[in-house]
Amino acid sequence: MTVFRQENVDDYYDTGEELGSGQFAVVKKCREKSTGLQYAAKFIKKRRTKSSRRGVSREDIEREVSILKEIQHPNVITLHEVYENKTDVILILELVAGGELFDFLAEKESLTEEEATEFLKQILNGVYYLHSLQIAHFDLKPENIMLLDRNVPKPRIKIIDFGLAHKIDFGNEFKNIFGTPEFVAPEIVNYEPLGLEADMWSIGVITYILLSGASPFLGDTKQETLANVSAVNYEFEDEYFSNTSALAKDFIRRLLVKDPKKRMTIQDSLQHPWIKPKDTQQALSRKASAVNMEKFKKFAARKKWKQSVRLISLCQRLSRSFLSRSNMSVARSDDTLDEEDSFVMKAIIHAINDDNVPGLQHLLGSLSNYDVNQPNKHGTPPLLIAAGCGNIQILQLLIKRGSRIDVQDKGGSNAVYWAARHGHVDTLKFLSENKCPLDVKDKSGEMALHVAARYGHADVAQLLCSFGSNPNIQDKEEETPLHCAAWHGYYSVAKALCEAGCNVNIKNREGETPLLTASARGYHDIVECLAEHGADLNACDKDGHIALHLAVRRCQMEVIKTLLSQGCFVDYQDRHGNTPLHVACKDGNMPIVVALCEANCNLDISNKYGRTPLHLAANNGILDVVRYLCLMGASVEALTTDGKTAEDLARSEQHEHVAGLLARLRKDTHRGLFIQQLRPTQNLQPRIKLKLFGHSGSGKTTLVESLKCGLLRSFFRRRRPRLSSTNSSRFPPSPLASKPTVSVSINNLYPGCENVSVRSRSMMFEPGLTKGMLEVFVAPTHHPHCSADDQSTKAIDIQNAYLNGVGDFSVWEFSGNPVYFCCYDYFAANDPTSIHVVVFSLEEPYEIQLNQVIFWLSFLKSLVPVEEPIAFGGKLKNPLQVVLVATHADIMNVPRPAGGEFGYDKDTSLLKEIRNRFGNDLHISNKLFVLDAGASGSKDMKVLRNHLQEIRSQIVSVCPPMTHLCEKIISTLPSWRKLNGPNQLMSLQQFVYDVQDQLNPLASEEDLRRIAQQLHSTGEINIMQSETVQDVLLLDPRWLCTNVLGKLLSVETPRALHHYRGRYTVEDIQRLVPDSDVEELLQILDAMDICARDLSSGTMVDVPALIKTDNLHRSWADEEDEVMVYGGVRIVPVEHLTPFPCGIFHKVQVNLCRWIHQQSTEGDADIRLWVNGCKLANRGAELLVLLVNHGQGIEVQVRGLETEKIKCCLLLDSVCSTIENVMATTLPGLLTVKHYLSPQQLREHHEPVMIYQPRDFFRAQTLKETSLTNTMGGYKESFSSIMCFGCHDVYSQASLGMDIHASDLNLLTRRKLSRLLDPPDPLGKDWCLLAMNLGLPDLVAKYNTSNGAPKDFLPSPLHALLREWTTYPESTVGTLMSKLRELGRRDAADFLLKASSVFKINLDGNGQEAYASSCNSGTSYNSISSVVSR
């Protein structure tokens, strides 16, 4: 942006008389103080906002200045200097004081063509100079052709006004519609490309007028003029051209040519015989021919008359366009104008509305006898309209022209009223100084202070009060300004009036005080302000309602809290005897009932009909309110005036559920017992959950058994036999002697994942961890489904146990067998009151130990959703408690001093690495516990016990204490489990109903939600929550976690060929779990994404976790009969490059099965599954989904016919959306990103395939490139071919990486940025400086936390900054990256490079018709909620 001189122009120049004015500019004579030289100062009004139409845009001003700076010619005006202030840009120009050329010529008695061409030649010379610089003026007309000095023998022409001038770039097409209709070229009218030729047309028109005094194309209307121009409709009439030479007419004809290419250029015109005669005869013909001076003088006179009228029509045009804008004030509306108003009145009002002071001044100057006090048709004089618009200059002008300061409109309002209505403080000061009356009432009894309050102008109200305006004046409705403020909710106005000393207890005609008005309308801040200034809280209206009654009736909870905190009378009765509690109970508003009861209201007050609040609630059948009133001690035996109890009223209205509750509470002893059950006791929560995670053989079961052993029992405890004696492949005796190969370990955990790219750019492993990552798992050489150990844990083993020296626990041991992982998301990380123990064996090499721990911690972290709002530094409020335990220290001969603890030499480095990665997400104990899992009495085991006991005590201390009802439910659960039989699932609603029906009728749903959460914490039940499972209680976790899933997923011997593909009949499932209701069980498993039912076949069920078939269809066949297009993506984790939890791919397969079954209604969709892969065919396109790169990526490859590119795009988008939905719902804490596969290598079936990462696209985009180099193939591939199969329709509607709006950054990305930028940086390179760079400095003061306050639970300032900044349309990911780099935060910018999406499709609804159902592709046919609801 060009920066002009910011100094005050008045410091350097003395400004004098006005020389002229335009729409947005005024030209004044000025004198330079330092030299005494005279110049013209052109004041151009700047446009305030982009959307505004008032003023000139910055771009247009800078263009005019740049052109003026470039030009220097005797016939063109020159620029001296440029200044700028808040409202204007001031151009200091050469003073052209000779007036217009045409005015000068009109004064002559006669003029030959020869004399005329001398002036015209100067114009042509000036235009020749401009065109040589490729500058087109675009506004050549008589008014812009001036004389430098008319008093010299040969006056010099000056071309002025370069406001429309443009530098023509012949490489870029330029179109616009501008200029004066009489002089514009046809290409402007027709909106065709413009060039220098447009000026030549204007010269032709000027010449025509100069010679004849007539305008060639002028019509009666603007439209007619433009039509004449477009049609080139002109002629040389004898009346005007009788004395005109043939050469002059030829000159004009060659210029007024419609085709710009055939029009004379400036060079041609200078060589034309009329301008430059070729012989004496041509020269003589010019001398003999004369300008038609009679007509020319008439033209000049007519022009001056038009200029007089033009001011009025200009005002009319400007204000009409102004009135159509959306940002006009209330005064600037059509209520001040009418077609029946005089033309002059309209012009005056238009000029006022548009702040056109010069225009109004000219207009009034030409209307010497006009009475400016006369009103328009609506009875509003101009002075009042000007007061409403707030322009003091116009007020001064009107008063100077005779406007009375006390003039009123037909409603009795004066100028103060109008200014107050629109909030013009300076205008009010001006009116007050000029003695305009303040407290004039209009016909409705209102004065200025009323209207200021009604429109929320606190500064105006404050000013009027300071001027002495009476704040207690009432209008015809007896309302004060404070009533108006209270009704409309203007706190600042109410505060100003209260501080001015107004009476806060005046009542209006309805008997309402301002407090009653504000309370009814819910303005708690005004209520608080009024109370602080002495408002009577118990003042009542005509119906006896106090403020609390009205707030309760209108459900204004914040007002109710304010009134109660201020001490209003809570038991006040209205004229019917109803207290606020009566009103709340009748309406059934539970939160208000609770608030009133907590304020110690009387529960048993009777109204005039003898009814207590309990009677009203019972009569209306509001069970929750009845229950709460009874709990709080309301009398159930109270009688109405006609002798009825609350129970009688409920029965008469057939509210049997209410009547039944009241019947059970008749005896006070029963009610007392129920109330006692709900009160907290001194008993602490008896147990919490201990969850153990680790790979098979890490010693989890042994560790639990050892922790259960007491001191005496530990002497007699027999060690569990080591499996290495019988299965050396599973537990090698020495990691050095029997180190497993990569292929063994990876094939067993991720069969079929070995086809990874070997080039460094395609590998997903982190530097330094590659070795360990490739050997993460030491699994049996057989397929993991073939269990080699009958003693190994099946699914999730759950037991209640007392751990000696620690306390009672519900112990949940999660099997290390990957086949069970697909069910862990419902149980692993759903309780922050649990202790999570990650166990690993020291038998493994250090790299494998580290990566096993990373695997499980990534799993736990991924299961925890992001909390909103994001906390300071991205921290979690309740991170999971994690303890790391290393086993087999005895076998590995870890050194241990006599009687001391094992000393593992790598514990510090392992803990440091783990805490660096997961310290913000998990609460990891500071110590790594190294022990022999079988030595229950060892020192190491004792240290672990002590640590677990400390954590347990800490957790239990913050858990709510037990209630008798909770203990009662625990004792009742066994009988409920027995009653439920094969289905141990129950909805929360059913649980609430059963407890209320069988155990305690006074327990509310909120009470029982808390109790259910406590039972969940103890492990008695499990609350299951997800998108498909909401508020479902698993009454017996062992039933599902151990019995059902343990049996179903550990199936060993297939009974049929299709079992290898994981397909089972309903009968097969029934045989696997014979004790369960198979239909309900399948719906449960379906909702958990463990299986997918094929509704088309009716009896088949897909269970991907049980698939044994491997390596089917892992790549496309080479034979292709038709031309195909290829494309694909790889979905990978962004941060920690560990394998996806195996279960996630099973869930992906389940959802893809479900999705393809939804698509296959026409029989053209098919899916084939195998271990870690599947192949889909749908509507002519084929798709592979593969788990690759040792489980660290999910690849989606699509191919289809060249003619079906859009189908391929939609299929890829739908399947990726399905996978991303599964990720988001199952692993909400895992951030993933899409990398793109080389379509050319996919087409050539070339492996390894080049992987394009987001940073590749961003780098290319920065360099303005639209293709990427395939370094493997040595060729380039375009963005469109990589991302959308070369489909230009899709590509054109998409946003690319840098241009994607920053609001698309997901919460996990924002949380990571908060973690990087929230903490104060020593060099200031944190969120504060970023806020300044993004243009939001106000947020720094608002969210700055450097005041020593604890930061743990403060909201993230970076998150707040992004939320604010992304409301602007120009906030793109690319802008954010560049701002971060400018800040010096390359770490944050590089993270964005890794995590940001590079392609966002914005397809319209029509394009997605084929895959409309993909929107909910991750949604199960069933939800557990629907299962248990029956």
From Swiss-Prot:
Activity regulation text: Activated by Ca(2+)/calmodulin. Regulated by a locking mechanism, involving autophosphorylation at Ser-308 and calmodulin binding. In the inactive state, Ser-308 is phosphorylated. Activation involves its dephosphorylation and a release-of-autoinhibition mechanism where binding of calmodulin induces a conformational change that relieves the steric block of the active site by the autoinhibitory domain. Activity is modulated by UNC5B and NTN1. UNC5B activates it by inhibiting the phosphorylation at Ser-308, whereas NTN1 inhibits UNC5B-mediated activation of DAPK1.
Region (Calmodulin-binding) residue spans: 267-334
InterPro entries, A to Z: Ankyrin_rpt, Ankyrin_rpt-contain_sf, DAPK1_cat, DEATH-like_dom_sf, Death_dom, Kinase-like_dom_sf, P-loop_NTPase, Prot_kinase_dom
Keywords for this protein: ANK repeat, Apoptosis, ATP-binding, Calmodulin-binding, Cytoplasm, Cytoskeleton, GTP-binding, Kinase, Nucleotide-binding, Phosphoprotein, Repeat, Serine/threonine-protein kinase, Transferase, Translation regulation, Ubl conjugation
Annotated EC: 2.7.11.1
Result of changing S308D: Reduced Ca(2+)-calmodulin binding and Ca(2+)-calmodulin-independent kinase activity. Decreases apoptotic activity
PROSITE patterns, per database record: ANK_REP_REGION, ANK_REPEAT, DEATH_DOMAIN, PROTEIN_KINASE_ATP, PROTEIN_KINASE_DOM, PROTEIN_KINASE_ST, ROC
UniProt cofactor(s): Mg(2+)
Catalytic residue list: D139 (proton acceptor)
Pfam family, one: Death
GO biological process, one term: cellular response to hydroperoxide
Spans of repeat ANK: 378-407, 411-440, 444-473, 477-506, 510-539, 543-572, 576-605, 609-638, 875-904, 1162-1196
PANTHER family registered for this protein in UniProt: DEATH-ASSOCIATED PROTEIN KINASE 1 (PTHR24342:SF17), SERINE/THREONINE-PROTEIN KINASE 17 (PTHR24342)
This protein's name: Death-associated protein kinase 1
Organism the protein comes from: Homo sapiens
Encoding gene per record: DAPK1
